[in-house]
């Protein structure tokens, strides 16, 4: 999914990814005006190279890059000792579009001995390792701060700190969970939330005392073995509209508003993002939503966080606004859509970012999808047009490529149907037109014998 960060890149920026972006997709995006340099760690299509071990392949990208950088530094020192003119920064393979082939290395040369900006999707435990190995970089918030503000416990307490209604109840043991749950069940079902669950994962709907007793019993056994419980319990609210607001907190505490995105959720899970219309913005202004966000952003800055932040919010069926459902102290899918829209909005268009979960037939290649979209007239080929923009290749192909390589190497016997996920920007005149485009995309995939599961 690291490929999805290309909308944040300028022509001289480098997008680091785990696997090589499909060259046809890379050239297609460059033709649309998304010009960037690409470096990658693995080229899975190169059958001359051994497949990486699973534990190596799944390592955090920061760890992979840090190890590569450290190995490169060691190699440079050895070569310099014997007078070699070994070039810098050759640790990761690179793709350069024709536009950069002649002189695209200037900016990196300038950055070699200065502080470089680093913009990760999220800060992880391995970020500090990479900063030390490959820096200097512009400052990032420390991991402890990021973990704390990402917790649903933090966001629940934040609501109290700024004087807003708190819907959640904290529970730090099985007994506390059962006690708080009994109170909530008098009003109806409730959600038992993992403080660090992402995109609805980690939420469990409790609809009765019998189910609650089973969960509490399981937690009690874990606690007696030495583990600790922590959950947030929230009533199952009658939601009307899910949306998110996106901001950037500067290191000095100044706040920049980026966008409000309406979320197309499927039950508790993320299903897509589209820019909020003027009617929703006016409703939020009238409800004091943006004043509440200013207070929340101020607290985040006071607590040491800076960088991109997303507030998941909702409007209930009765019209009440719940300003903070959770905080995502990182980039987000809605933010990616907001940056894509910076391109489409110059032509008066709006993008819907969504995805399709796929099952791939034998012999499928990403280039076949691009060709089929082009032949059908669905592929958006000019910024001022309408159509489908595929955003990533490896989310679609990585499992298929790994499966094929393992079968070839005798490590696997049955292919099954490898799964993938196709992220797309659907650029249309209005909601009806965008729905028509996504339905046509489904038909193109069906014609390619690709199964769509959602």
Language model regions located:
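Peripheral (often C-terminal) accessory segments that flank ATP-dependent C-N-forming ligase machineries
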Residues: 346-454
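ATP-dependent carboxylate/phosphate-activation module, predominantly the ATP-grasp catalytic core
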Residues: 240, 247-297, 304, 328-355
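ATP-grasp fold ATP-binding core
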Residues: 159, 184-205, 223-239, 311, ...
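Histidine-anchored nucleotide/phosphate-binding helix
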Residues: 2-10
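Glycine-rich phosphate-binding loop of ATP-grasp-fold ATP-dependent ligases
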Residues: 168, 190-215, 243-244, 267-280
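Phosphate-binding site of ATP-dependent enzymes
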Residues: 214-265, 315-323
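Conserved N-proximal alpha/beta basic substrate-recognition cap immediately N-terminal to
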Residues: 4, 17-179, 183
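A long amphipathic alpha-helix within ATP-dependent nucleotide-binding catalytic cores
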Residues: 269-318, 359, 364-385
């Amino acid at each position: 999914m690291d490929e999805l960060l290309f909308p944040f890149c300028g022509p001289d920026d480098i997008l680091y990814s785990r696997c090589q972006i499909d060259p046809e997709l890379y050239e297609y995006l460059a033709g649309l005006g998304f010009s960037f340099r690409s470096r990658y760690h693995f080229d899975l299509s190169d059958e001359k190279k051994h497949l990486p071990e699973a534990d190596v392949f799944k390592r955090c990208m920061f760890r992979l890059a840090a190890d590569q950088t450290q190995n490169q530094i060691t190699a440079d020192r050895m070569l310099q000792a014997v007078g070699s003119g070994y070039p810098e920064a050759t640790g990761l393979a690179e793709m350069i579009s024709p536009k950069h082939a002649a002189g695209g290395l200037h900016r990196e040369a300038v950055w070699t001995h200065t502080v470089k900006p680093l913009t990760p999707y999220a800060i992880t435990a391995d970020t500090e390792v990479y900063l030390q190995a490959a820096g200097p970089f512009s400052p990032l918030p420390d991991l402890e701060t990021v973990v704390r503000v990402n917790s649903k416990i933090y966001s629940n307490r934040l609501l109290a700190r700024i004087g807003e209604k708190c819907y959640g109840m904290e529970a730090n043991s099985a007994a506390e969970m059962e006690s708080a749950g009994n109170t909530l069940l008098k009003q109806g079902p409730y959600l038992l939330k993992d403080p660090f669950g992402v995109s609805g994962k980690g939420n469990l709907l409790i609809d009765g005392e019998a189910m609650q007793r089973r969960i509490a019993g399981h937690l009690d056994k874990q606690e007696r073995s030495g583990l600790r419980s922590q959950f947030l319990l929230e009533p199952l609210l009658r939601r009307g509209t899910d949306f998110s607001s996106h901001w950037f907190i500067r290191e000095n505490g100044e706040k920049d508003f980026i966008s409000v995105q309406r979320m197309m959720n499927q039950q508790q899970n993320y299903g897509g993002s589209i820019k909020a219309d003027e009617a929703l913005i006016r409703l939020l202004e009238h409800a004091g939503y943006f004043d509440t966000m200013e207070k929340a952003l101020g607290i985040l800055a006071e607590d040491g966080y800076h960088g991109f932040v997303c507030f998941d919010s909702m409007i209930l069926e009765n019209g009440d606004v719940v300003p903070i459902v959770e905080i995502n102290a990182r980039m987000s899918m809605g933010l990616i859509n907001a940056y894509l829209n910076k391109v489409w909005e110059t032509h008066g268009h709006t993008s819907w970012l969504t995805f399709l979960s796929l099952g791939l037939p034998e012999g499928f290649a990403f280039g076949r999808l691009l060709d089929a979209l082009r032949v059908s007239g669905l592929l958006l080929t000019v910024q001022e047009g309408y159509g489908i923009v595929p955003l990533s290749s490896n989310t679609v192909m990585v499992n298929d490529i790994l499966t094929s390589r393992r079968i070839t190497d005798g490590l696997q016997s049955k292919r099954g149907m490898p799964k993938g996920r196709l992220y797309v920007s659907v650029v249309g005149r209005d909601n009806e037109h965008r729905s028509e485009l996504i339905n046509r995309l489904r038909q193109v995939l069906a014609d390619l014998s690709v199964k769509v599961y959602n």
